[in-house]
Amino acid sequence: MTRILATGTFDLLHPGHIYFLTQARALGDELFVIVARDSNVTHKPKPIVSEEQRLEMVNALGIVDKALLGSEKDMFEPLKHIRPDIIALGYDQRFNAENLEEELAKRGLPANVVRIPLSKECPLCSTGAIIKEVLKRYG
């Protein structure tokens, strides 16, 4: 049984997220998802939707076997329990796949890292695009 792990913020869940998770799920038999904690989102604006609500939405998706919140202190902590065979990265996630594989191996968590390419273009396939459209329409 091949266990897949995907991670992300999943703020304002949109078709781009669904595409990413669907492609990740296709890589194996079980899909686990780590939803970023509000406190760990430092590379972009803080999420609009709370971490608990984002977790609830991701867990409600039929393609996801189990979603859980990430660790506030060590991003590798949940991986010790999940023990994924493959980690799926989104096209825009800032991890270097080779460096991540090396760090995982050092921690006794060998896993292949696969980057999921950008989905077909759609007008509202990013949280930023959704926010811009809402501001444009409703100011």
Curated annotation (Swiss-Prot):
**What's its catalytic activity?**
FMN + ATP + H(+) = FAD + diphosphate
Keyword annotations of the record: ATP-binding, FAD, Flavoprotein, FMN, Nucleotide-binding, Nucleotidyltransferase, Transferase
Binding-site residues, ATP: T9, F10, H14, P15, G16, H17, D92
- InterPro entries under this entry? Archaeal_FAD_synthase, Cyt_trans-like, FAD_synth_RibL, Rossmann-like_a/b/a_fold
GO MF term list? ATP binding; FMN adenylyltransferase activity
Cofactor(s) named in the record: a divalent metal cation
Enzyme Commission identifier(s) = 2.7.7.2
Which pathway? Cofactor biosynthesis; FAD biosynthesis; FAD from FMN: step 1/1
Instruction: Please give the SUPFAM superfamilies that the UniProt record associates with this protein.
Output: Nucleotidylyl transferase (SSF52374)
GO biological process assignments: FAD biosynthetic process; FMN metabolic process
Using the UniProt record, name the top-level EC class of this enzyme in a single word: transferase
Q: How does it assemble?
A: Homodimer.
Q: What is this protein's function per UniProt?
A: Catalyzes the transfer of the AMP portion of ATP to flavin mononucleotide (FMN) to produce flavin adenine dinucleotide (FAD) coenzyme.
Database matches in HAMAP family: FAD_synth_arch
Q: Which family does it belong to?
A: Belongs to the archaeal FAD synthase family.
The family database entries (NCBIfam families) matched by this protein are listed as:
cyt_tran_rel
Q: What is this protein called?
A: FAD synthase
Supply the source organism's classification. Archaea, Methanobacteriati, Methanobacteriota, Stenosarchaea group, Methanomicrobia
